Amino acid sequence: MSTNFEKHFQENVDECTLEQLRDILVNKSGKTVLANRFRALFNLKTVAEEFATKPEEAKKAIEYIAESFVNDKSELLKHEVAYVLGQTKNLDAAPTLRHVMLDQNQEPMVRHEAAEALGALGDKDSLDDLNKAAKEDPHVAVRETCELAINRINWTHGGAKDKENLQQSLYSSIDPAPPLPLEKDATIPELQALLNDPKQPLFQRYRAMFRLRDIGTDEAILALATGFSAESSLFKHEIAYVFGQIGSPAAVPSLIEVLGRKEEAPMVRHEAAEALGAIASPEVVDVLKSYLNDEVDVVRESCIVALDMYDYENSNELEYAPTAN
C-alpha cells in the first residue's frame, strides 16, 4: 500500500491534457523521470474521481492509468497505479484490477496491491475472484491481501459500517481495514497486544493498527513499531505505510532499521523508504542517499522518489505539476 507520495505530487490538471498526462505516465518519450510519472498519475486520479459529474473523462482517465500495467518495467509504479485505482472509488477500475490480481505474469507486489484496491472499491462483484486468489495464489502476501479485501467488502456491505462509531480520521485514504470503533475503548497497551497477536484474524489486527494510527501519539507510534517483529511481510509493510501517513519523526529510528534489513522483503523495505521520504526530516536524507544503489529495484526507486519528495518539501516551489516531454 502506498499513498504517501500523493500529497507531494498532486497538482491541478489544467496544465496538461489527459493525453499529455497519459504520455507522461507511460513514459512515451522514454525520457520521463519517475517522479514526473508519479505526478501525472495523481493528476489522472483527480479526473478519475469525478465519475459522478464527468463520467466520460473519468472513464478515459481510468483507461489511461491502466495502460501502465501492460509493458511497464517499474514494479514500484505499477503497484502505485493499482493503489490509485482503488482510491478513486470508481468501479470502472474493477475489471482491470481483477485481471491484474489474477495475472501471474505481474509481480506479487503489484497483484497484492490490485487485490487491496478491490477491497478499497468495496466491489462485491470481485468476491469470487478474491476468494479464489485467497486460496490458490502462490504468494502469501497476495493471499493475505485477498483475505483482508474480502473482510473489508463484507464489512462495507454487511451493515457493520453503518452501526460502528469510528473516530473521524485525519486521513483521506481508504484503508485495507477500518479502525476499531470508539466503543471498544481500548487502551494503547491493549491495542498493541491485539496488533501483535498472531492468533487473531488479520483483519482485526489491522483494525488495531489503524486505531493506533488515528491516536497518533508517540506512545501509539512506539506501539506500532513493535509490529515490525511480525512474521508477515504484508503486515510489516502496512506498519511502514502508516508511519508515513502519521509523518512523525518519532517513527524515523524504526523505519531506518527496517530499511537496513537486507533480508527483509522488498515490499517492506520500499515502504519504509517511502515513509521516510514522507516524514521529510533532515536526518533521513543521508539514509535515503545510501540506498540509491540498492540491488533491489523497488527499494532503489523508492529512495529516488523519496528524495525528490524531500527536495520539494524543503524548497520554495509553489507549483509541482508535470510537464509534457
Curated annotation (Swiss-Prot):
- Modified residue annotations for N-acetylserine: S2
Catalytic reactions of this protein: [eIF5A protein]-deoxyhypusine + AH2 + O2 = [eIF5A protein]-hypusine + A + H2O
Task: Name where the HEAT-like PBS-type repeats lie.
Answer: 77-103, 110-136, 202-231, 235-261, 268-294
GO BP terms: microtubule cytoskeleton organization
Which cellular compartments is it found in?
Answer: Cytoplasm; Nucleus
Phosphothreonine sites (modified residues)? T187
Q: What is its EC number?
A: 1.14.99.29
InterPro entries for the chain: ARM-like, ARM-type_fold, Deoxyhypusine_hydroxylase, PBS_lyase_HEAT
Binding positions for Fe cation 1? H79, E80, H112, E113
Q: Principal localization? A: cytoplasm
Q: How is the cofactor bound?
A: Binds 2 Fe(2+) ions per subunit.
Effect on the protein upon substituting E271A = Abolishes iron-binding, substrate-binding, and enzyme activity
The entry's description of pH dependence is: Optimum pH is 7.5. Active from pH 6 to 10.
Q: Residue positions of the PTM Phosphoserine?
A: S126, S281
Tell me the protein family, please: Belongs to the deoxyhypusine hydroxylase family.
Q: What else is known?
A: Present with 39900 molecules/cell in log phase SD medium.
- Specify the protein name: Deoxyhypusine hydroxylase
